[in-house]
Amino acid sequence: MVTRKPAVAGMFYEASKDGLINQIKWSIEHELGPKSTMNVKENRQYVLSVIVPHAGYVYSGPVAAHAYVEVGKYIKPKVFVIIGPNHYGVGSPAAIMTSGTWETPLGQVEIDEEVAKQIKAKVKDLAEDPIAFEREHSIEVQVPFIQYLFPGSRIVPIVLWNQTIDLSRRLGSAISEVIDGRAGEVVVVASSDLNHYEPHEVTTDKDMKVIERILNMDEEGFYTVMDKYDVSVCGFGAIMTAIVYSRKQGSTGVKLLKHATSGDTSGYLLETVGYASIAFYK
């Protein structure tokens, strides 16, 4: 069995178990965090997918916490399908792991083999390629939040450096077909930061342009606006996949839970990265 060892523990998040738990709690209770508990509401609504940032926890942790706390208000998922960009271009253009475990300072989380293999069978672009995940942080930084808030749940990791609209549509449709009838048990996580390395006001303005298209569940419009205004979204393929998946599942609403930039947490406003947590509901 393959165990994917942590690559960014001690850099993007605390390397010790106690330190990491405290950092997750800090993210939740931070002035930019959700500050709320996850008492499951007694209604039939649930979260289909979320868009979550993936920077170091000291920068984006409070924004990321909004997404996971929101999920926990409605459901306790059994599986998280986590899709992120391949920042390093290592390995296959589209990669998945269909077996094994992922390790963090909080322990190991299992890959859901059934769901992963069914998705891979429907999307021929996806290669079984653990090498593509070895250095990549976009999936890894999501895992501790899932382990801490949803113990016992499993994951399906997917990374893309092929981020075309075509692949995103096919992947979103395939996940919908695999999950059909089980949406309340599965959440799709699109791991992405928004605009990069521009002043706080510029980043905020650019982010809001693409967020508007996301809230309209318009993947093509999102891509067009991103290109037109040079918004340097790193995980745009993951975001488009979540939009398509949610629409295929009959999403009845989308909500911007929180937006901030690294300047809001660090105080340095000259070169910032944008972060948003967004939830799609049914």
Swiss-Prot record:
SUPFAM superfamilies: LigB-like. It holds the Pfam family Memo. It comes from the Archaea. Belongs to the MEMO1 family. This is MEMO1 family protein Cmaq_1590.
